[in-house]
Amino acid sequence: MKETVLQNYMQLKTEVYESIIPKNIEHAILSEANWLGRGNLMSGEDVGFFVEVGDIVYMDYGQAYLNEMGYQHFGLVMAISEKKALVIPMTSNAKTYANAYDPESNPEGKKNLFPLPGIIDGLCKKSVLFLNDMKFVNTARMIEKKAHIDVKSPVFRKIQLRIMMLLFQNPSVI
């Protein structure tokens, strides 16, 4: 029975990789390999990876549903709790950046998107945060630190305020 279950699973995986996600096959396989290698870790600390609030990390979000960040992307660490980090996924996609809300330059933009000002030291392109896709994840998903935003900086505080507005949709809460 166990052998049949395994064969059925492998056949299904093969079909999925060949048909449903052909454009993401490399990312999907890499994500699965990352999960196999790190999925049993309590945190990134188990492999010598220590993260701090404000770090921008390259990480593996794993498989995703539609409208969720998946596979390997950058993320901004907003908080740490019990070996898990609250991470906001980000992209350098120019079209997404152009659609992001900014009270001065794009007041009609999407409020779930937060454009980071300029190019952050350690990154190569302008980036935008997906505020409505933030989540707590095991820090073992994190592969490499790429940059850092000072938690006392005005930009970090603006991100925190926008999160509060997005979550509670009432500026008086802030």
What are these regions (language model features)?
Residues 1-174:
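Conserved functional hotspots at enzyme active or ligand-binding sites that engage polyanionic ligands
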